[in-house]
Amino acid sequence: MDIIYLLCFISLVLLLVFMYFTMLRKNEFEERLALYRPQHQLSQKREAYLKKVRKFRLWVTGIIIVIFLAPLFLYLVLMIQEGVEVLHLLFPDEIIGETLLSLLIPFLVYYLLSYVFKRNEKALHMLVEQMSDSDFDLLLKVKDSLFVLTRYNPPFVLCNKQLYFFIFYAIREIDPAKITDINWGYSKNGLYVKIKSPKVTRITMSRETLSYLLQIVEQYNSKIRTF
């Protein structure tokens, strides 16, 4: 059991480190996002889009709850029904400790995923509020190019001549004119795209979605290198 406990502990430490970089360490855009509050009434078309973004987030959160929190609730019900003393008679203290540690990890994963989807929803609201009509029309085209289950979770957004890439652990703001080259290839999760600006950004998207990204970058940088 010591090996199981060690693996759980290492997984917990790695998860906490990842949570730090995702939730606490913010770039300039994410710092602005943290201070953002909706200020303007949006058009009916934009409000309709944001409502569907919210529905997507709630739908994903519901799935996450079922997958990650159901085991924790079952364990708590068992503790209430049997009583803590009975559990101590049936299981040594170290087994109970390992079980609680293994249940803590799914709860933290749920918390992290919930944070990411809430952050992305807030960022989309902020960008949709600030973008031009042409940028919003492009956002809708990108939406239609995505897989039906991810249409309201775009990999990138163009707003006021800036590109915003939605990576899991961060949202990066990049000037398309500063992108030097774009490489791509196929992976298990789809089309794998590598963007240099000069910092390297890696993200996955469909080929059709990539075509919109290339159009944007070529519009601001005609010397862009693509592979």
Predicted regions and their residues:
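Acidic, Ser/Thr- and proline-rich intrinsically disordered linker/docking segments
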Residues: 125-138, 181-227
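Short, surface-exposed beta-strand-loop junctions and turns on beta-sheet-rich folds
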Residues: 170-173, 199-201
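Hydrophobic transmembrane signal anchors and adjacent membrane-proximal interface regions, especially
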Residues: 1, 89-91, 95-96, 137-140, ...
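Domain-scale macromolecular recognition modules
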Residues: 172-175, 192
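N-terminal recruitment modules of adaptor/scaffold proteins
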Residues: 111-172, 181-183
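Eukaryotic intrinsically disordered, low-complexity regulatory linkers and tails enriched in Ser/Thr/Pro
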Residues: 1-134, 151, 227
